[in-house]
Regions:
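N-terminal carbohydrate-binding accessory modules
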Residues: 22-80, 209
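Aromatic-lined substrate-binding rim segments of carbohydrate-active enzymes
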Residues: 65-125, 187, 191-198, 282-296
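Feature marks short, surface-exposed loop/turn motifs that line or immediately flank catalytic pockets
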Residues: 55-57, 87-91, 124-126, 169, ...
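Extracellular glycoside hydrolase catalytic/binding regions
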Residues: 30-31, 62, 135, 141-162, ...
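Bacterial N-terminal signal peptides
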Residues: 7-15
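Sec/Tat signal peptide C-region and signal peptidase I cleavage site
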Residues: 17-21
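Positively charged n-region of N-terminal signal peptides that target proteins for export
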Residues: 1-4
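Aromatic- and acidic-residue-enriched carbohydrate-binding clefts of CAZyme catalytic domains
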Residues: 98, 128-137
């Protein structure tokens, strides 16, 4: 082979492999919104029971970004995986290299029968561009550009069922500046418009304030867009027991009209590794949140499938379940194959 041709092939092969991951259409059927439900295009109702990955960038750096990681989720009973993309990791790795990671993850997930949420994993106030920690720093321009890029790339791949527009909006009681619900609603509508302009029909997931817990404003001012679902992160310490009536008042009522996904739930004991507010509780929380989700047809995703981030689901890379891991592995197994 001539040296010039060989050099050209060496340049093109990584690009072609990356593009093939994005364009490979797996056997999963596209999910869409129908009233307050998720349904596939062939009419099957979907209620998701999933697991949160840690950031693909972190997993790749530690040597654990591999198909078997997602296969273990499938063995636990998951039908959905959430990929949290930290803005800092997106910038440090670079868009093209990070997209190559997502291409791999989406391809593996599709092969395993797992749907995907791509989550822009920031915490703070996108209006003022002030954040809880430097790792979450982003700008509106960067956020909008991220969703334009991701939407264009995965619009034809039904494995990617959801785009979670912003992980946890919060003003931290004014420490991050002010943002009203109408202002936050308008920012989400802008993001959805950018996504739709690419031709993507992927379902946007919209979170409310108080670290994605509170959806009370949706009652009177829902997002002005079709095919949208809403998010809550009802960790156990957000409210005191008994939880159920408070959950209904704060976010559960939304499920009467729109689909709801609890994209982060989980717990750990007060003496468990990584215990922190708002996740400290016990199995009674697991019983309550899973029963509530089952009763109301609400989807959920447990945080987090990693032995370092908390509340962790396993303690080592043999996937030895932690306390909450044992609980949710058993809970998810009830849904496997449905």
């Amino acid at each position: 082979m001539k040296p010039v041709i060989l050099a050209i092939l060496l340049v093109l092969i990584p690009f072609l492999i990356s593009e093939s991951f994005a364009r490979t259409l797996p056997a999963l059927t596209r999910v869409q919104v129908q009233g307050n439900r998720f349904v596939t295009t062939d009419g099957k109702r979907m209620v998701f029971r999933g697991l949160n990955a840690s950031d693909p960038d972190k997993l790749d750096k530690s040597g654990h970004w591999e198909k078997d990681y997602l296969a273990e989720m499938k063995r636990w009973g998951a039908n959905l995986v959430r990929f949290p993309v930290h803005p800092s990791a997106w910038r440090e790795r670079g868009a093209d290299a990070y997209l190559a990671l997502l291409d791999q993850g989406v391809a593996w997930a599709g092969q395993l029968g797992l749907y995907v949420i791509i989550d822009w994993h920031s915490i703070g106030n996108l209006k003022t561009e002030m954040y809880q920690d430097p790792m979450y720093h982003t700008t509106r321009q960067e956020t909008y550009a991220f969703w334009r890029t991701v939407a264009a790339r995965y619009k034809d791949n039904p494995t990617v069922a959801f785009f979670e527009l912003f992980n946890e909006p919060t003003t931290m009681s004014g420490k991050l500046g002010d943002c009203t619900w109408p202002e936050w609603k308008a920012i989400n509508e802008e993001m959805i418009g950018i996504i739709r302009s690419t031709g993507a029909e992927t379902i946007p997931l919209v979170a409310g304030f108080n670290w994605a817990y509170d959806l009370t404003d949706v009652a009177t001012q829902p997002v002005a867009a079709e095919g949208v679902a809403y998010v809550s992160h009802p960790y156990p310490m957000k409210r005191e027991k008994p939880w159920e009536d408070k959950w209904t008042a704060d976010w559960g009522f939304v499920a009467n009209k729109y689909p709801v996904v609890l994209t982060e739930i989980g717990f750990c004991g007060p003496d468990d590794k990584g215990a922190h507010v708002p996740v400290v509780s016990d199995e009674s929380y697991g019983d309550a949140i899973t029963a509530y989700a089952d009763t109301h047809g609400i989807s959920y995703v447990v945080w987090v499938f990693d032995p370092q981030w908390a509340p962790m689901l396993f303690s080592d890379w043999n996937y030895t379940p932690t306390r909450q891991g044992r609980y949710f592995k058993k809970a998810l197994s009830k849904y496997a194959g449905r």
